[in-house]
Amino acid sequence: MGSRLHVQQIKNGPPLPYKDDIRAFTRDYAASLDAQDPLSHFREEFIIPSVKDLKRKTLDPSEGEYSSMYLDARCIYLCGNSLGLQPRNTKKYINYYLRTWAIKGVTGHFTHHDDELLPPFVDVDSAGAKLMAPVVGALESEVAVMGSLTTNLHLLMASFYRPTTERYKIIIEGKAFPSDHYAVESQIKHHNLQPKDAMVLIEPQDPEHPILETDRILRVIDEHASTTALLLLSAIQYYTGQYFNIEKITAHAQSKGIVVGWDCAHAAGNVDLKLHDWNVDFAAWCNYKYLNSGPGGMAGIFVHEKHGEVKAGQGDGELELFRPRLSGWWGGDKATRFLMDNHFVPQSGAAGYQLSNPSVLDMNAVVASLELFNRTSMAEIRQKSLNLTGYLEHLLLASLDGVSDKPFSIITPPNPSERGAQLSLRLAPGLLDSVLETLEEYAVVIDERKPDVIRVAPAPLYNTYEEVWQFCQIFSEACRKALEKKD
């Protein structure tokens, strides 16, 4: 998309004080925005790698071959959409857990301590759900911290994808994250159906403009409504950074009798979700991106309360009624869990979808981060994110003014309400490797998607306006060098 058109389409966002201010292009101005930032204190709650750390060849903290002040400076980490940084209190939480395990052994499952950070092992999942609920806009009973993202998608589809001879299709976006694609494809095959018949891919009208307009999504839903069992979309598209209109799409699909699920991997902790109010049937997400719970950390699920009810049997010997699912003992009613009578009665809500005893080690890492989110609100985090990513966009677009041989374009929607923290930059052909080399030289951490896209995601809890300004200076230099090499 051309920079002029992109600027014209920027709308519906917060006031941008820097839009018409020439001072916005100075480092001092960026620093002044940081000075006014009500969330700035959260930055010190995270461990931000130094330039020296990134260049280390060992993990030995005594390694001292790098000594310049520059190398001791913090890197510019704009990759929270891939892996969030470690909160400082993660170590404290995990050490408390290790201490409990060491001195209590199995009795740690039920023993309370006066100075505990979390309840006994047997109840840690409840602590995680309590802190997670406000982050995704859910009732506490509607969320569970469990498993991993793709595993959870399979578990949820086992419950919510109930194909019939009339309704058997699953609609997903054409460029869904590969693991989602694999999961949907394998679920279809599991039911002895063929993906070519039962898998509907929503593709953009123009491959050069990979945004899926809401109207296009609704048209595809209408086209396949009578034969579709499930709609499963990403809340935020991992490649473009597009934030879909969850409320509108969900209501439209449900009005056609379609069950609706959302992969919120790039949305949880990023945008102000309202999964309960939007009447979403189910959702799943990982917690290691914007929610900073560590590589492969424990994930989360949402099951709307209307699907989580457990009804008592109507008479003697009648079994309880609940939504079919793949069951495990940790999802069972806590009052009867340890009776070992082989009669499964699930907990109500999302907790009833749990299978095994959760990893208390992983749960501590999740809670350590969620505790920070619960010190503020997703509305406040989202407000800063809109401002921070808006500033990034403003500086990037300004760098293209008057440039005939444009080194990049922004493929993320210009409307701030249609994106999260991430901007996806499509580089001109042949520039990617050189640009990445320069960014690495200056200790800028972003990620790439071959063949020509880099994703830049300022995380509002630990990134600053000054870092955004620095990135834009370095990125402009990287593009200049890449163009010179190309010539």
Curated annotation (Swiss-Prot):
The domain of life is Eukaryota
Q: List the disulfide bonds.
A: none
- Supply one GO CC term from the record: cytoplasm
Q: GO terms for molecular function, please?
A: kynureninase activity; pyridoxal phosphate binding
Kindly tell me the pathway this chain contributes to.
Amino-acid degradation; L-kynurenine degradation; L-alanine and anthranilate from L-kynurenine: step 1/1; Cofactor biosynthesis; NAD(+) biosynthesis; quinolinate from L-kynurenine: step 2/3
Localization per Swiss-Prot or TrEMBL? Cytoplasm
**What cofactor does this one take?**
pyridoxal 5'-phosphate
Where this protein primarily resides, as one coarse class? Answer: cytoplasm
Q: Which residues bind pyridoxal 5'-phosphate?
A: 149-150, 177-180, 234, 263, 266, 288, 329, 357
Q: Which UniProt keywords apply?
A: Cytoplasm, Hydrolase, Pyridine nucleotide biosynthesis, Pyridoxal phosphate
User: A Pfam family for this UniProt protein?
Assistant: KYNU_C
Which family does the UniProt entry place this protein in?
Belongs to the kynureninase family.
The name on file for this protein is: Kynureninase 1
